[in-house]
């Protein structure tokens, strides 16, 4: 298929067979598996996945590419035309669990991750391509310069590991950055107790909003300060003068629990 990549959709089509095979291997697909692919593009991954699974849903925003996918005479293939950020995944994926496999458009990859977190009950495993820098952030631990919002939020719910490094030449057109494929395995139980996911996310975002500031200043600046904040932090064993990047998942859990009663 002759198709000119569209910059507005962040299209960099995967064309390296070894990378496709590596993604396929990481997915560990079984004949009964149901899979969601976001951004199938020219179909390099789609062609590899389709013969091996019970059902393959694909979400494609480019109607030209979507028409080509819809023209395939494949009962197992379900094509959803539209923006993955706007479509209702719960309505589309009615018989979970699914495996999510995608070469994500880099301009929306972080937004897609937040949507995945909101729909994590739908998925047992994710195998996702990211810009290398984003991949490093997702895998980073406390004390690392790459440790941040995505690290904390994803590691609460998933085991994450890098399975492939991918050079620009694996794509057409080649991006200006290197890429990484990560595998996320859903945990049976989160690593910490999260009573209110949205409030927990709010606290984590506030703590990292200004990385060079202390927790005391970051939380207050984000509207999460209250009388007695410092005492509450100290009682929880958290120095108010620390920075967010030094906190463990457990400490973020404590932080959310001690702040939330003041904002109910």
UniProtKB/Swiss-Prot annotation:
Q: What is its EC number?
A: 2.1.1.182
Q: Source organism's superkingdom?
A: Bacteria
Q: Name one Pfam family in it.
A: RrnaAD
Which UniProt keyword terms apply here? Cytoplasm, Methyltransferase, RNA-binding, rRNA processing, S-adenosyl-L-methionine, Transferase
What GO terms fall under cellular component here?
A: cytosol
Q: Give the reaction(s) catalysed.
A: adenosine(1518)/adenosine(1519) in 16S rRNA + 4 S-adenosyl-L-methionine = N(6)-dimethyladenosine(1518)/N(6)-dimethyladenosine(1519) in 16S rRNA + 4 S-adenosyl-L-homocysteine + 4 H(+)
Q: Which GO terms describe its molecular function?
A: 16S rRNA (adenine(1518)-N(6)/adenine(1519)-N(6))-dimethyltransferase activity; RNA binding
Primary enzyme class: transferase
- From the Swiss-Prot or TrEMBL record, state where the protein is found: Cytoplasm
Q: Which residues bind S-adenosyl-L-methionine?
A: 12, 14, 39, 60, 83, 103
Task: List the InterPro entries hit by this protein, alphabetically.
Answer: KsgA/Erm, rRNA_Ade_diMease-like_C, rRNA_Ade_Mease_Trfase_CS, rRNA_Ade_methylase_Trfase_N, rRNA_adenine_dimethylase, SAM-dependent_MTases_sf
Function, please? Answer: Specifically dimethylates two adjacent adenosines (A1518 and A1519) in the loop of a conserved hairpin near the 3'-end of 16S rRNA in the 30S particle. May play a critical role in biogenesis of 30S subunits.
UniProt family annotation:
Belongs to the class I-like SAM-binding methyltransferase superfamily. rRNA adenine N(6)-methyltransferase family. RsmA subfamily.
Name of the protein in its database record: Ribosomal RNA small subunit methyltransferase A
Organism annotation: Syntrophotalea carbinolica (strain DSM 2380 / NBRC 103641 / GraBd1)
Gene that specifies this protein: rsmA
